[in-house]
Amino acid sequence: QDRNYIRNNIIPSIEQRWVKASSRISNTSEFIKIKNQSYEILFEEKFNHLINKKIKVKDLKEIDEPFVVDIIRHSIRKQNIAMPSKKVIEEIIKTFIQSNPGPKSLVSWTRADKDQVGGEICYKDGCIIISKK
């Protein structure tokens, strides 16, 4: 219902106010898509050696936090585990990167719809270990 409201009311109103707004939005979207693809290629070239189920915390602490988040997200995706929420990602960063993790450090998550298996990250021998829950 919201989608129809946007399509039938909001977009025509925008089109009246700004000429070729849909075309501009489409062009911007395409530009972002291309930039995203470029980022993905460069990211994987630079950090592919870290994208794994076992990652040294020391290596992650030497990298800017936005890249650490992407390394963790790519590693989770590689294991076919449900992607954690933004809040859980923040907890992972706080627990393993911003703090000094120990053997009891653990962050886990699930999906309410059970569409994908949940995951957990623990700390062992200086590494975070990403596994299915």
Region annotations inferred by a language model:
Residues 9-22:
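Conserved anion/nucleotide-ligand pocket segment
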Residues 1-2:
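Noncatalytic alpha-helical scaffolds and linker/capping helices
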Residues 8-11, 26-133:
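AMP-forming adenylation/ATP pyrophosphatase catalytic core
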